[in-house]
Protein backbone atom coordinates (compact mmCIF):
# COMPACT_ATOMS: atom_id res chain seq x y z
CA UNK A 1 0.00 0.00 0.00
CA UNK A 2 3.04 2.28 0.28
CA UNK A 3 2.75 3.35 -3.38
CA UNK A 4 -0.87 4.43 -2.92
CA UNK A 5 -2.28 7.75 -1.82
CA UNK A 6 -5.23 8.14 0.57
CA UNK A 7 -8.58 8.02 -1.21
CA UNK A 8 -10.02 10.73 1.04
CA UNK A 9 -8.60 14.05 2.18
CA UNK A 10 -11.16 14.53 4.98
CA UNK A 11 -13.15 11.90 6.86
CA UNK A 12 -15.68 11.63 9.66
CA UNK A 13 -15.01 8.64 11.89
CA UNK A 14 -17.83 7.36 14.10
CA UNK A 15 -16.56 5.46 17.12
CA UNK A 16 -19.22 3.66 19.13
CA UNK A 17 -19.03 3.45 22.90
CA UNK A 18 -19.19 -0.32 22.48
CA UNK A 19 -15.99 -0.22 20.42
CA UNK A 20 -14.23 1.82 23.12
CA UNK A 21 -15.26 -0.70 25.77
CA UNK A 22 -13.45 -3.49 23.92
CA UNK A 23 -13.63 -6.74 25.82
CA UNK A 24 -14.66 -5.03 29.06
CA UNK A 25 -18.29 -4.61 28.07
CA UNK A 26 -18.53 -1.28 29.89
CA UNK A 27 -16.07 1.52 30.55
CA UNK A 28 -13.03 2.34 28.44
CA UNK A 29 -10.53 -0.34 27.48
CA UNK A 30 -7.19 1.49 27.58
CA UNK A 31 -5.61 -0.90 25.09
CA UNK A 32 -8.39 -0.17 22.59
CA UNK A 33 -8.02 3.57 23.18
CA UNK A 34 -4.29 3.28 22.57
CA UNK A 35 -4.75 1.33 19.32
CA UNK A 36 -7.40 3.73 18.05
CA UNK A 37 -5.27 6.79 18.78
CA UNK A 38 -2.32 5.18 16.98
CA UNK A 39 -4.44 4.40 13.91
CA UNK A 40 -5.80 7.96 13.82
CA UNK A 41 -2.32 9.43 14.28
CA UNK A 42 -1.17 7.36 11.30
CA UNK A 43 -3.86 8.94 9.13
CA UNK A 44 -2.83 12.41 10.28
CA UNK A 45 0.72 11.56 9.25
CA UNK A 46 -0.60 10.83 5.74
CA UNK A 47 -2.24 14.25 5.59
CA UNK A 48 -5.81 13.03 6.10
CA UNK A 49 -8.05 15.48 7.98
CA UNK A 50 -9.94 13.62 10.71
CA UNK A 51 -13.20 14.47 12.44
CA UNK A 52 -14.53 12.06 15.06
CA UNK A 53 -17.93 11.50 16.65
CA UNK A 54 -17.96 9.27 19.72
CA UNK A 55 -20.88 7.41 21.24
CA UNK A 56 -21.50 6.91 24.95
CA UNK A 57 -23.05 3.47 25.34
CA UNK A 58 -20.01 2.11 27.16
CA UNK A 59 -20.60 4.53 30.03
CA UNK A 60 -24.36 4.95 30.08
CA UNK A 61 -27.33 3.11 28.64
CA UNK A 62 -30.60 4.76 29.51
CA UNK A 63 -33.03 2.19 28.15
CA UNK A 64 -33.39 0.32 31.43
CA UNK A 65 -33.84 3.45 33.53
CA UNK A 66 -36.38 4.76 31.04
CA UNK A 67 -38.18 1.41 30.89
CA UNK A 68 -38.59 1.41 34.66
CA UNK A 69 -39.80 5.00 34.65
CA UNK A 70 -36.87 6.29 36.71
CA UNK A 71 -35.91 8.95 34.16
CA UNK A 72 -37.71 10.45 31.20
CA UNK A 73 -36.53 10.11 27.61
CA UNK A 74 -35.17 13.66 27.43
CA UNK A 75 -33.21 13.27 30.66
CA UNK A 76 -31.92 9.88 29.58
CA UNK A 77 -30.72 11.26 26.26
CA UNK A 78 -29.03 14.18 28.01
CA UNK A 79 -27.21 11.73 30.28
CA UNK A 80 -26.07 9.89 27.17
CA UNK A 81 -24.76 13.13 25.68
CA UNK A 82 -22.64 13.71 28.78
CA UNK A 83 -21.25 10.18 28.47
CA UNK A 84 -19.96 11.05 25.00
CA UNK A 85 -18.13 14.03 26.49
CA UNK A 86 -16.24 11.73 28.86
CA UNK A 87 -15.27 9.45 25.98
CA UNK A 88 -14.21 12.47 23.96
CA UNK A 89 -11.97 13.71 26.77
CA UNK A 90 -10.26 10.32 26.93
CA UNK A 91 -9.73 10.21 23.16
CA UNK A 92 -8.44 13.77 23.07
CA UNK A 93 -5.79 13.07 25.68
CA UNK A 94 -4.82 9.79 23.99
CA UNK A 95 -4.24 11.66 20.73
CA UNK A 96 -2.39 14.53 22.37
CA UNK A 97 -0.02 12.05 24.00
CA UNK A 98 0.91 11.19 20.42
CA UNK A 99 1.52 14.88 19.69
CA UNK A 100 -1.66 15.25 17.63
CA UNK A 101 -3.30 18.64 18.18
CA UNK A 102 -6.91 17.85 19.04
CA UNK A 103 -10.02 20.00 19.48
CA UNK A 104 -12.93 18.81 21.60
CA UNK A 105 -16.12 20.46 20.36
CA UNK A 106 -19.47 19.99 22.07
CA UNK A 107 -23.02 20.50 20.86
CA UNK A 108 -23.82 21.46 24.47
CA UNK A 109 -21.97 24.37 26.13
CA UNK A 110 -19.78 22.94 28.91
CA UNK A 111 -17.64 25.87 30.01
CA UNK A 112 -13.97 25.09 30.47
CA UNK A 113 -14.23 21.41 29.51
CA UNK A 114 -14.94 21.78 25.78
CA UNK A 115 -15.45 24.48 23.21
CA UNK A 116 -18.82 24.97 21.58
CA UNK A 117 -19.31 23.33 18.20
CA UNK A 118 -19.10 25.51 15.10
CA UNK A 119 -18.79 24.02 11.64
CA UNK A 120 -16.78 27.02 10.43
CA UNK A 121 -14.26 26.68 13.25
CA UNK A 122 -14.13 22.91 12.81
CA UNK A 123 -13.26 23.21 9.12
CA UNK A 124 -10.60 25.79 9.96
CA UNK A 125 -9.05 23.46 12.56
CA UNK A 126 -9.14 20.51 10.18
CA UNK A 127 -7.38 22.49 7.46
CA UNK A 128 -4.67 23.32 10.01
CA UNK A 129 -4.14 19.60 10.65
CA UNK A 130 -5.94 19.37 14.00
CA UNK A 131 -8.19 16.42 14.79
CA UNK A 132 -11.71 17.50 15.80
CA UNK A 133 -13.73 15.37 18.21
CA UNK A 134 -17.44 16.17 18.21
CA UNK A 135 -19.32 15.26 21.39
CA UNK A 136 -22.81 15.57 22.92
CA UNK A 137 -24.45 14.23 19.78
CA UNK A 138 -26.58 16.83 18.01
CA UNK A 139 -27.29 18.53 21.33
CA UNK A 140 -30.92 17.47 21.10
CA UNK A 141 -32.78 14.48 22.55
CA UNK A 142 -34.31 11.82 20.28
CA UNK A 143 -31.32 11.85 17.90
CA UNK A 144 -28.68 9.12 17.93
CA UNK A 145 -24.94 9.59 17.73
CA UNK A 146 -25.13 7.88 14.32
CA UNK A 147 -27.31 10.75 13.15
CA UNK A 148 -24.89 13.19 14.77
CA UNK A 149 -22.03 11.56 12.86
CA UNK A 150 -23.81 11.95 9.53
CA UNK A 151 -24.79 15.53 10.33
CA UNK A 152 -21.26 16.52 11.33
CA UNK A 153 -19.82 14.70 8.33
CA UNK A 154 -22.05 16.69 6.00
CA UNK A 155 -21.30 19.96 7.80
CA UNK A 156 -17.52 19.56 7.64
CA UNK A 157 -17.75 18.37 4.01
CA UNK A 158 -16.17 14.98 4.71
CA UNK A 159 -15.58 12.71 1.73
CA UNK A 160 -16.84 9.66 3.61
CA UNK A 161 -18.37 8.68 6.94
CA UNK A 162 -16.67 5.69 8.51
CA UNK A 163 -18.51 3.67 11.14
CA UNK A 164 -16.11 1.69 13.31
CA UNK A 165 -17.81 -1.30 14.94
CA UNK A 166 -17.01 -4.72 16.35
CA UNK A 167 -18.27 -6.43 13.16
CA UNK A 168 -16.44 -6.45 9.83
CA UNK A 169 -19.28 -4.99 7.79
CA UNK A 170 -23.02 -5.26 7.21
CA UNK A 171 -24.78 -8.65 7.25
CA UNK A 172 -28.29 -9.74 6.31
CA UNK A 173 -28.69 -10.99 9.90
CA UNK A 174 -26.71 -10.99 13.12
CA UNK A 175 -23.52 -13.00 12.44
CA UNK A 176 -23.04 -13.68 16.15
CA UNK A 177 -26.35 -15.58 16.20
CA UNK A 178 -26.52 -16.99 12.67
CA UNK A 179 -23.64 -18.98 11.17
CA UNK A 180 -25.14 -18.59 7.69
CA UNK A 181 -25.28 -14.78 7.86
CA UNK A 182 -24.32 -13.19 4.54
CA UNK A 183 -21.95 -10.24 4.44
CA UNK A 184 -22.45 -7.45 1.92
CA UNK A 185 -19.41 -5.86 0.27
CA UNK A 186 -21.48 -2.99 -1.10
CA UNK A 187 -25.03 -1.67 -0.76
CA UNK A 188 -27.03 1.30 -1.95
CA UNK A 189 -28.84 3.56 0.50
CA UNK A 190 -32.14 2.41 -0.99
CA UNK A 191 -31.24 -1.25 -0.36
CA UNK A 192 -30.39 -0.48 3.26
CA UNK A 193 -33.73 1.27 3.75
CA UNK A 194 -35.81 -1.31 1.88
CA UNK A 195 -34.22 -4.31 3.63
CA UNK A 196 -34.12 -2.53 6.99
CA UNK A 197 -30.48 -3.48 7.49
CA UNK A 198 -29.04 -2.27 10.77
CA UNK A 199 -26.32 -0.04 9.35
CA UNK A 200 -27.48 3.13 11.08
CA UNK A 201 -30.86 4.50 12.07
CA UNK A 202 -33.16 5.68 9.30
CA UNK A 203 -32.59 9.39 9.97
CA UNK A 204 -28.83 8.97 9.58
CA UNK A 205 -29.18 6.95 6.37
CA UNK A 206 -31.64 9.44 4.91
CA UNK A 207 -29.25 12.32 5.63
CA UNK A 208 -26.36 10.61 3.86
CA UNK A 209 -28.53 9.64 0.91
CA UNK A 210 -29.90 13.15 0.49
CA UNK A 211 -26.42 14.71 0.58
CA UNK A 212 -24.71 11.90 -1.33
CA UNK A 213 -22.09 11.15 1.33
CA UNK A 214 -20.93 7.50 1.25
CA UNK A 215 -20.71 5.33 4.36
CA UNK A 216 -18.29 2.55 5.16
CA UNK A 217 -18.80 0.08 8.02
CA UNK A 218 -15.74 -1.82 9.23
CA UNK A 219 -14.20 -3.62 12.20
CA UNK A 220 -11.91 -1.22 14.07
CA UNK A 221 -10.36 -4.11 16.00
CA UNK A 222 -8.97 -5.68 12.84
CA UNK A 223 -5.30 -4.68 12.35
CA UNK A 224 -4.82 -1.87 9.79
CA UNK A 225 -8.54 -1.81 8.96
CA UNK A 226 -8.86 1.98 9.17
CA UNK A 227 -5.79 2.47 7.00
CA UNK A 228 -7.11 -0.07 4.50
CA UNK A 229 -10.38 1.84 4.19
CA UNK A 230 -8.59 5.13 3.63
CA UNK A 231 -6.37 3.56 0.99
CA UNK A 232 -9.36 2.18 -0.91
CA UNK A 233 -8.79 -1.47 -0.03
CA UNK A 234 -11.68 -3.94 0.14
CA UNK A 235 -12.59 -3.56 3.81
CA UNK A 236 -15.98 -3.84 5.46
CA UNK A 237 -19.13 -2.73 3.64
CA UNK A 238 -19.53 0.40 1.53
CA UNK A 239 -22.93 2.12 1.28
CA UNK A 240 -23.46 4.66 -1.47
CA UNK A 241 -26.07 6.26 -3.72
Curated annotation (Swiss-Prot):
It comes from Psychrobacter sp. (strain PRwf-1). It catalyses: UMP + ATP = UDP + ADP. One of its GO terms (biological process) is UDP biosynthetic process. GO terms for molecular function: ATP binding; UMP kinase activity. Pathway: Pyrimidine metabolism; CTP biosynthesis via de novo pathway; UDP from UMP (UMPK route): step 1/1. InterPro entries: AceGlu_kinase-like_sf (IPR036393), Asp/Glu/Uridylate_kinase (IPR001048), Uridylate_kinase (IPR011817), Uridylate_kinase_bac (IPR015963). It comes from the Bacteria. This is Uridylate kinase. UMP binds at residues 56, 77, 138-145. Allosterically activated by GTP. Inhibited by UTP.
Amino acid sequence: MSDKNPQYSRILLKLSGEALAGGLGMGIDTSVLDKMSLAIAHLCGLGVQVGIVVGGGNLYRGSQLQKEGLVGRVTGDQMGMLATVMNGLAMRDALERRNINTRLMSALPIGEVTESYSSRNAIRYLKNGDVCIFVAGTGNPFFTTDTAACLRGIEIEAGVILKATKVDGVYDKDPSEHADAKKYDALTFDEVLEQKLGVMDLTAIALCREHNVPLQVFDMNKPNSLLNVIMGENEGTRVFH
